[in-house]
Amino acid sequence: MASTFSKLLTGRNASLLFATLGTSALTTGYLVNRQKVCAEARDQHKLFPPSADYPDLRKHNNCMAECLTPSIYAKLRNKVTANGYTLDQCIQTGVDNPGHPFIKTVGMVAGDEESYEVFADLFDPVIKLRHNGYDPRVMKHPTDLDASKITQGQFDERYVLSSRVRTGRSIRGLSLPPACSRAEAREVENVAITALEGLKGDLAGRYYRLSEMTEQDQQRLIDDHFLFDKPVSPLLTCAGMARDWPDARGIWHNYDNTFLIWINEEDHTRVISMEKGGNMKRVFERFCRGLKEVERLIQERGWEFMWNERLGYILTCPSNLGTGLRAGVHVRIPKLSKDPRFSKILENLRLQKRGTGGVDTRAVADVYDISNIDRIGRSEVELVQIVIDGVNYLVDCEKKLERGQDIKVPPPLPQFGKK
């Protein structure tokens, strides 16, 4: 219910108050009262016990729904981060979206760096479930951006059509996209593009604001897999990441269109190296070199990326913690993709398949997007090498099937570098 003071601020009453009290006094009083009203509204749910607020997850199939219990919910429901982010905001996207037909989604997001600590009783088991047993309570995440360690990074281009490596980075001290204010999002954009202006050589390029693009230009970039899609995915909309679109969103790319930075989509930044063909070693070398240079330029301006030794690089979705890295190829495998052993082969190689256009798309002309399923517990070098070895195995299987030969399901890869 609106307070008497709030009602006074409507219609002609507001004008009279401005004239009588003066702008400064009224503004101060209004802001104080508004903060009180917002706090009261946020605390309304506390009038009910946690059991009355517990979400109905009986038909859900995501990691959050599998890990959340009434006792965990009761323990965490009334906690908030320093930025005011709550457990219910973390899990809302998973409550609104029971599951996915092709992949098991996480079902929750973080609103800021502190979310992973304040709500660790839920985030930690979700991370362990999603990341093949990685336990952030006792394990430490390795980082390695030495591209010279990669071997056999050239694919057979009769099968592999394109190669790509991406990651995300978050700027410490600013809320993540689910909780980002307009001012914070604009600050992310400003920090990023100011740093990117310092890139030289083959990394040099320019920034394009989404708000200044035509619809035709946007769609062309989306179709060419350069630009993120419009904010229609349930993850973005239900988690609040589509707010104020397209304000403070954009894409930076070098003049060769092989090194890209997305600004303010699911994460503060997405750093991408890509090119046609099968030279994954060259793509990864450019990725490592560009990422290191971007971080150096960010730090020169007094900022840093969110990182800790338990979780690695901090990003919005727990699925991207650690390296945040997804190394992928578009590969044409018409025979293997129809073999009943295909899914098991991918599982044992720690790979996942998506349609030609990514998540929620189908394979066109038997072309699949194949990438690493893990993000945390292994270094960037390890994950890219897993993709290289795995895709070479898939191509070898395709060639054997073309010759009428049998193929084998490989043994499962050991966890986290264990021998």
From Swiss-Prot:
Pfam families cross-referenced by the UniProt entry: ATP-gua_Ptrans, ATP-gua_PtransN
Location within or outside the cell: Mitochondrion inner membrane
Residue numbers bearing the Phosphotyrosine modification: Y255
GO biological process assignments: phosphocreatine biosynthetic process
Location of the Phosphagen kinase C-terminal domain: 159-401
Cellular component GO terms held in the UniProt record: mitochondrial inner membrane
InterPro entries, A to Z: ATP-guanido_PTrfase (IPR000749), ATP-guanido_PTrfase_AS (IPR022415), ATP-guanido_PTrfase_cat (IPR022414), ATP-guanido_PTrfase_N (IPR022413), ATP-guanido_PTrfase_N_sf (IPR036802), Gln_synth/guanido_kin_cat_dom (IPR014746)
Catalytic activity annotation: creatine + ATP = N-phosphocreatine + ADP + H(+)
Keyword DNA damage: no
EC number in record: 2.7.3.2
Top EC category: transferase
The organelle targeting sequence, given as a residue range: 1-39
Keyword Transit peptide attached: yes
Residue positions, PTM Phosphothreonine: T356
Keywords assigned by UniProt, alphabetized: ATP-binding, Kinase, Membrane, Mitochondrion, Mitochondrion inner membrane, Nucleotide-binding, Phosphoprotein, Transferase, Transit peptide
Bilayer disposition of the protein: Peripheral membrane protein
Domain Phosphagen kinase N-terminal: from-to ranges: 46-132
Binding site for ATP: 162-166, 225, 270, 326, 354-359, 369
Note: Mitochondrial creatine kinase binds cardiolipin.
Family, as annotated: Belongs to the ATP:guanido phosphotransferase family.
Listed PANTHER family: ARGININE OR CREATINE KINASE (PTHR11547), CREATINE KINASE S-TYPE, MITOCHONDRIAL (PTHR11547:SF19)
Known partners and oligomeric status: Exists as an octamer composed of four CKMT2 homodimers.
Task of the protein: Reversibly catalyzes the transfer of phosphate between ATP and various phosphogens (e.g. creatine phosphate). Creatine kinase isoenzymes play a central role in energy transduction in tissues with large, fluctuating energy demands, such as skeletal muscle, heart, brain and spermatozoa.
Protein name: Creatine kinase S-type, mitochondrial
